[in-house]
Amino acid sequence: MPLPKIATPTYELVLPSTGKNIKYRPFLVKEEKVLVIALESEDNKQITNAIKAVLKACVQTKGVRVETLPTFDIEYLFLNIRGKSVGEQLEVNIICPDDEETQVPVSIDLDEIQVEKSEEHSNQIKLDTNLMMEMKYPSLEQFIKSNFDFNDTNQMDQSFQLIASCIDKIYSDEEVWATADCTKKEVNEFLESMNSAQFKEIEKFFETMPKLKHDIKVTNPKTGVESDVVLEGLASFFA
């Protein structure tokens, strides 16, 4: 006689980027093993790929392509799946800002962690009095490939390619140019023709993108100093 199947509950959440409602299940022991092995490797690419594989297995709504979701959707989705799988209290070690060395364990309720959307953020960039550009959010795949970092000069070329891939269209009052209909060379040359002020507006798009964020207070047991700490991005919640 075959062993019985264990029923797995399903839950729902709303994707921050689109407002779309999706169903998901907790990850199973076999999927948790994949995550543990990846985390132990301390390799960012392996960890990211493990998260992506687990999300593909856990998302139950048809038509959701995990690899194309914006990074903040990925982070929010994974955090919720993790909460339903192993507990909704997350233990994080925080380094006290006043001495930058003392670590304090803090328990965070996962329900309190949300994706923050900046009022300054817009995917519409004005280039001049007649020309506008519409951006699209980078996917997890694009971040893996580019190792995106504006401040790392060694990565500027890869960052440039990421920016080019995130331009959805360029338009004026009379005409629209979809980058899907352009060559990479054409898009790159268009970017290179910008002045510094125009390019900074593109940087602002990435810097103000929605992100996981949570504010906490920590007290240094050695000094008694209380500090405000801001956790941003998925990595901060697994410190």
Descriptions of predicted regions:
Residues 1-239:
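Long C-terminal interaction/binding lobes of large macromolecular proteins
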